[in-house]
């Protein structure tokens, strides 16, 4: 392991860590947290952001463009995995992947990442170092391979900076909420954040996160999301999925959270 300081990072170094499934993650010394589950970065990403929310089936169906918004670009694994799945499925529709990252890592650090996967295109191995090598504050847009309609729209800065000015050509289909925990990063887990998601999406949008605390579920419910418990990844008992109250995409095999009670607890000031 070696410390690497980000070009924008004022929060101290990060360390490379090999997780138990053979994939790379990082450990933030400032937040005192891993970027992914140390039991398996790739495995966690697959379950939380592609399997549990039905995105794998949507990609395989190849029935239109897909728009994803991610809070916390981190190592870029979720973008890389989404691109891989689109190419592997020979899905010729566009993928627009929006993400926010306040403290991007260096391209040198990204160049050392390893994953136990055979990428759909070998060039995928070079995409992340290329992304991290050319970042500016604000919006950065990349099309890593002109032969595929795969676009990364990466905002370097804080989510609050774009909440009131976000302009999209198409509503968001899937939300990947992958910020550091509510204990370490509470500003990313408020009803205001989840209301922005609500406004940027559509009736069938789906929100997924690795977290399961009552506080974050209450914030979602307060923003008019219908919240569900889902089995957690790699030793975690639960994770969280959410959809619009009248969505046709409501998961039928999951347990709904007590949404009204959570909403009342939030507005009652339990976490203020």
Which ranges hold each PLM region?
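The AdoMet/dcAdoMet-binding core of the Class I SAM-like
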Residues: 55-170, 191, 223, 233-234, ...
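Conserved Class I S-adenosyl-L-methionine
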Residues: 217-238
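A short SAM/SAH-binding and catalytic strip from SAM-dependent methyltransferases
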Residues: 173-188
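Conserved beta-strand signature within the Rossmann-like core of class I S-adenosyl-L-methionine
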Residues: 174-177, 203-211
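N-terminal auxiliary segments of SAM/dcSAM-dependent transferases
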Residues: 1-35
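A short glycine-rich, Lys/Arg-flanked "PGG" loop and its adjoining helix->strand segment in the class I
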Residues: 187-204
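SAM/dcSAM-binding transferase cores
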Residues: 2-3, 12-17, 143-148, 238-272
């Amino acid at each position: 392991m070696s410390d690497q300081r980000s070009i924008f990072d004022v929060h101290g170094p990060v360390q490379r860590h090999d997780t138990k499934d053979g994939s790379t993650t990082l450990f933030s010394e400032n937040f005192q947290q891993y970027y992914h589950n140390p039991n398996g970065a790739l495995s966690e990403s697959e379950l939380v952001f592609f399997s549990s929310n039905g995105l794998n089936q949507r990609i395989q169906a190849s029935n239109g463009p897909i728009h994803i918004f991610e809070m916390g670009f981190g190592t870029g694994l979720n973008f890389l995995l989404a691109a891989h799945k689109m190419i592997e499925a020979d899905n010729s529709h566009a993928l627009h992947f929006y993400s926010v990252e306040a403290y991007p890592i260096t391209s040198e650090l990204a160049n050392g990442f390893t994953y136990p996967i055979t990428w759909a295109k070998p060039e995928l191995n070079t995409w992340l170092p290329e992304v991290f090598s050319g970042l500016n504050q604000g919006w950065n847009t990349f099309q890593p391979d002109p032969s595929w309609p795969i676009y990364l729209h990466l905002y370097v800065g804080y989510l609050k900076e774009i909440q009131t000015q976000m302009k999209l050509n198409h509503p968001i289909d899937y939300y990947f909420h992958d910020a550091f925990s509510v204990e370490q990063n509470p500003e990313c887990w408020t009803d205001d954040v989840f209301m922005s998601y609500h406004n940027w999406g559509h009736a069938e949008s789906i929100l997924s996160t690795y977290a399961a605390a009552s506080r974050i579920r209450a914030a979602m419910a307060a923003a008019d999301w219908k919240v569900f418990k889902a089995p957690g990844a790699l030793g975690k008992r639960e994770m969280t999925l959410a959809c619009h109250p009248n969505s046709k995409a409501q998961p039928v095999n999951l347990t709904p959270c007590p949404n009204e009670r959570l909403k009342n607890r939030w507005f009652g000031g339990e976490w203020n």
